[in-house]
From Swiss-Prot:
This is Isoprenyl transferase. Its EC number is 2.5.1.-. GO terms for biological process: polyprenol biosynthetic process. Belongs to the UPP synthase family. The gene is uppS. The keyword Metal-binding applies. Substrate binds at residues 31-35, 43, 47, 75-77, 79, 81, 198, 204-206. It comes from the Bacteria. Mg(2+) binds at residues 30, 217. GO terms for molecular function: ditrans,polycis-undecaprenyl-diphosphate synthase [(2E,6E)-farnesyl-diphosphate specific] activity; magnesium ion binding.
Length: 259
């Protein structure tokens, strides 16, 4: 990724124990439907409870040395859900921005929305643009919401954008490498995630940050998303801190033994 500053400059690529620098944590917020079902509630109430969990987690992340928090809000595959549920999920983004935007802005939070804007209704597109515009100058903390996002779609869109530059004579095929390609991803302005968390006990990444997660540590937690908050996040970060990030190399102790 291009060099970054402020809260985005959160991790290095030297091997060894997980860094104590500010982190980029990404969360697959899973379990809203099961949470509601366990309580005999409609799924929509699970999603609403999930918004409250997001608010708690954003606040907790800011005090846990997290510089960037990326959350999976709505995937490109979620359009296949019942229309009423899709409408509710769209409305929740709008409600969250309208209720919390000023508080986030005053707290120094920069809001970024990654994913395709095509297919979104004008009112949702306007809310997204307003949130990004209102917080564009903030640098204390980055809240990145993946909305109408899919990892495969992001890679496809990036490939298409580069191909279009070649067609216009602005680039050559030989210009393409990992570094130049990732500049076309919607995630280009943030560093790769250090830690990807999935809640609910499921153990898969579900088309989330496919390019970006190459060297991320994965933590799977059994807690359903509406029950999530600062304590669960702290537990995930503690597990991450105990790991040895090698980036394809070997641990320092292994090198010493081999020598």
């Amino acid at each position: 990724m291009p060099a970054t500053t402020g809260p985005q400059d959160v991790s290095g690529r030297a091997g060894g124990p997980a860094s104590t620098e500010r982190l980029h944590v990404a969360i697959i917020m899973d379990g809203n439907g099961r949470w509601a079902k366990q309580r005999g509630m409609p799924r929509v109430l699970g999603h609403r409870a999930g918004v409250n969990a997001l608010k708690r987690t954003v606040e907790g992340a800011q005090s846990q040395n997290v510089g960037v928090l990326t959350v999976f809000g709505f995937s490109t595959e979620n359009w296949s859900r019942p229309p009423q549920e899709v409408s509710e999920l769209m409305g929740l983004l709008k409600a969250y921005v309208e209720s919390d935007l000023e508080r986030l802005a005053k707290a120094g939070v920069r809001v970024r929305i990654i994913g395709r804007r095509t297919g979104l209704s004008p009112d949702i597109a306007e809310v997204i643009e307003r949130a990004e515009r209102r917080t564009a100058q903030n640098s204390e903390f980055v809240l990145q919401v993946a909305f109408n996002y899919g990892g495969q779609a992001d890679i496809t869109d990036a490939a298409r954008a580069f191909a279009e530059r070649v067609e216009r004579g602005e680039a050559k095929a030989s210009d393409l490498n990992e570094k130049t390609f990732e500049q076309f991803l919607s995630t280009a302005s943030a560093p790769p995630p250090d830690l990807i968390v999935r809640t609910s006990g499921e153990r898969r990444i579900s088309n989330f940050l496919l390019w970006d997660c190459a060297y991320a540590e994965l933590v799977f937690q059994d807690v359903l998303w509406p029950d999530y908050g600062p304590e669960a996040l702290a537990a995930a970060i503690a597990e991450y801190r105990g790991r040895d990030r090698r980036y394809g190399g070997v641990a320092a102790d292994d090198v010493a033994v081999a020598g």
